[in-house]
């Protein structure tokens, strides 16, 4: 609440917060049309970062033919479309960032595949191979860089998110609790 209050007072473009061990990043982005701050889910912020990071790597000619984007099986399919757009193979792993870390190690030890980006829906992503766990510090830096990049183009991060949906298609999310819905699923 305090962060949003300060953001409104300062007319900030975004609000960022990490958890105490700085491995998850929470994001609010400003919608300039309504003036409201919109919370991004982990799927949204991760997909937005993936698209931005890969677009910058592509512009620099740094996406190898064996580039891979890694996600957990519960992560949005939006990132599948992002990976495909940039010519990267999508690798799905079990839930838990340790499996993304294991995929990085596998790529390094076998020489097959080059890690480009990894994410899971629970607000975690990893931009490089310097770690084997999610990292909100590098995600914060990259998201701020993305915000500046889009601002130069006259866009907010929310505008960039909307543009992603227009480019790749929108995705909806529903969390089901088995004990509440099992009768309806039969």
Model-derived features: positions:
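A glycine-rich beta-turn/hairpin centered on an aromatic-Pro dipeptide
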Residues: 182, 186
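Conserved small/polar residues in nucleotide/adenosyl-binding loops
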Residues: 174-181
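Phosphate-binding chemistry for phosphorylated carbohydrates and sugar-nucleotides
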Residues: 1-167
């Amino acid at each position: 609440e305090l962060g949003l209050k300060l953001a409104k007072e300062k007319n900030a473009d975004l609000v960022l917060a990490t958890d105490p061990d700085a491995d998850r990043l929470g994001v609010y982005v400003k919608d300039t049309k309504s003036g409201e701050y919109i919370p991004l889910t982990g799927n949204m912020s991760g997909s937005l970062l993936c698209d931005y990071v890969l677009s910058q790597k592509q512009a620099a000619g740094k996406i190898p033919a064996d580039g891979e984007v890694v996600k957990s099986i519960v992560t949005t399919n939006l990132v599948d479309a992002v990976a495909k757009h940039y010519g990267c193979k999508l690798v799905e792993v079990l839930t838990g960032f340790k499996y993304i870390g294991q995929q990085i190690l596998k790529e390094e030890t076998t020489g097959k595949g080059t890690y480009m980006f990894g994410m899971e829906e629970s607000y975690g992503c990893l931009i490089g191979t310097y770690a084997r766990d999610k990292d909100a510090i590098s995600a914060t830096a990259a998201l701020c860089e993305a915000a500046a990049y889009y601002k130069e183009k006259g866009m907010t991060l929310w505008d960039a998110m909307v543009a992603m949906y227009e480019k790749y298609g929108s995705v909806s999310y529903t969390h089901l609790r088995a004990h509440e819905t099992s009768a309806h699923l039969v």
